[in-house]
Amino acid sequence: MKQSVSAEQIELKSSLPGSKKVYVDGPREGMKVPMREIEQSDTNGVPNPPIRVYDTSGPYTDPAYKVELEKGIPTPRHSWILERGDVEAYEGREVKPEDDGVKVASKHTPVFPQMDRKPLRAKQGANVTQMHYARNGIITSEMEYVAIREGVDPEFVRKEIAEGRAILPANINHPEAEPMIIGRNFHVKVNANIGNSAVSSSIAEEVEKMTWATRWGADTIMDLSTGKNIHTTREWIIRNAPVPVGTVPIYQALEKVNGIAEDLTWEVYRDTLIEQAEQGVDYFTIHAGVLLRYIPITAKRTTGIVSRGGSIMAQWCLFHHKENFLYTHFEEICEIMKQYDVSFSLGDGLRPGSIADANDEAQFSELETLGELTKIAWKHDVQVMIEGPGHVPMHLIKENMEKELDICQGAPFYTLGPLTTDIAPGYDHITSAIGAAMIGWFGTAMLCYVTPKEHLGLPNKDDVREGVITYKIAAHAADLAKGHKTAHQRDDALSKARFEFRWRDQFNLSLDPERAMEYHDETLPAEGAKTAHFCSMCGPKFCSMRISHDIREYAKENDLETTEAIEKGMKEKAKEFKETGSHLYQ
């Protein structure tokens, strides 16, 4: 792992063009909630107000912050956690070479240079989940923070968490994370998957992907590493992550038994859960709904079982002809989760991997089991969200949302797309964003991004950016459709800037200012083009917005309403046409 950050990397972490990091003071001393403020230029001397938008970039876009990845980022939640008086520090488990998939610990890659902290856990008999606090009428500092980010009342946040309609993923060992909420009555969130594989990527690359993804708007990160250095990669990511981090613990557990699924045991898996909870993982994808009796149903599918976690557990169940140990030990898993406030992301191990398999018996059988497990988790006051498909044609998407809300008692839905067609490898960020926008509108709380590399390879930095931006579009479109009270403000500001030919404001208000300016400047690179009343699409003579301005100006000069001006202008042009001989071409 590189021990320093280059000037180029620091530049990449600067704020987006035309923006600056601002902070809103919270109700308690020292609480500062980050926002991104987009400046706007005046319109004929009349000021246009700055637009504040949700910010996930962490301290990296604060010019006062010095980036030192080897030290990690600030820990704003640490004092809040300790003040509640229900946690204790302890030695924790010893980091073993097999945690990183090796037999001998590496001498070159420290787990983390600043590893002087002890993990926290709940005191004997205590429950430290945000759901437990909410159900006991307590509005935590995390809930107050979230309320400011979302523009809602803290009591509303508490109630949504208490009722299970939202989760606030916030492991007590990840104090670096800026609190956020996932629920259908809040902004639709976007998750970005990162992680190495056995054949590609390094620790440094994955940390950079994390900071890159959050810069472009990823609300959470999932580390899906399956290669070497799993533990170390995760430690570096968590210590530098301003957003919640999720994992699929079965991946690392499998590495510990040399990739042989049938050698997995509950003991190995349990040890992995504790290892990751001590590091600070905020939510676990756990495929406890893949039951032995469901596996034969998948035999008639076009694409069988496509979930990695689902296929691992199916293989274990068939080899031993026993029930899924994640299901049989679920109560014990809940006991671990509530000691650290790790949220469940109940995995859809039998999700459809093709349009042909959408909404089939296997998929919905597993969903019924996830509903059952949700009730058990809630009995322990453990937070839960439900993972969803997958590959689903547009006319079958709504049924997924309706069934999830009914079967899982309104727990937040977290979906991978869904992809609405199977014919576009290389463009599956688009095929899935169509489904993501729809299911977000119907009520999904968080969308898992898909990159152009889906089904083809491990995404690089550019793919991560493309995936995040594509899914921010889908999430925002869903917020607009749901009538979120602040969603339209940015659209209205950009539309006004567009009509007034304020090109730089158009770029800066967009989700990807750099891309917008790049495309504009391909054909009109001159600085004067930034104030021109046309673009290269229509040119100066055929710009519809310029013509609209001319009509308005004509109406103003002749003291007419706009519709009257159009009618009068038409009559004058008709008269002129006749007077010049009624020739079509002059």
Swiss-Prot record:
Q: Where is the composition biased (Basic and acidic residues)?
A: 22-39
- EC number of the protein: 4.1.99.17
Q: Which InterPro entries match?
A: ThiC, ThiC-associated_dom, ThiC/Bza_core_dom, ThiC/BzaA/B
- GO cellular component: a single term: cytosol
| Annotated binding of Zn(2+), by residue | 391, 455
Q: Name one GO biological process term.
A: thiamine diphosphate biosynthetic process
Q: Which molecular function GO terms apply here?
A: 4 iron, 4 sulfur cluster binding; carbon-carbon lyase activity; zinc ion binding
The cofactor note from the UniProt entry for this protein is:
Binds 1 [4Fe-4S] cluster per subunit. The cluster is coordinated with 3 cysteines and an exchangeable S-adenosyl-L-methionine.
What's its catalytic activity? 5-amino-1-(5-phospho-beta-D-ribosyl)imidazole + S-adenosyl-L-methionine = 4-amino-2-methyl-5-(phosphooxymethyl)pyrimidine + CO + 5'-deoxyadenosine + formate + L-methionine + 3 H(+)
- Which residues bind [4Fe-4S] cluster per the record? 535, 538, 543
For the protein in the UniProt heading, the enzyme class is lyase
Q: Which cofactor does it need?
A: [4Fe-4S] cluster
The protein's superkingdom reads Bacteria
Asked whether the UniProt record includes Metal-binding among its keywords, one would answer yes
Q: What residue spans carry the region label Disordered?
A: 1-59
Indicate yes or no for the key word Flavoprotein.
Answer: no
- Family membership, please give it: Belongs to the ThiC family.
Q: Which protein are we looking at?
A: Phosphomethylpyrimidine synthase
Q: Which organism is it from?
A: Bacillus cereus (strain AH820)
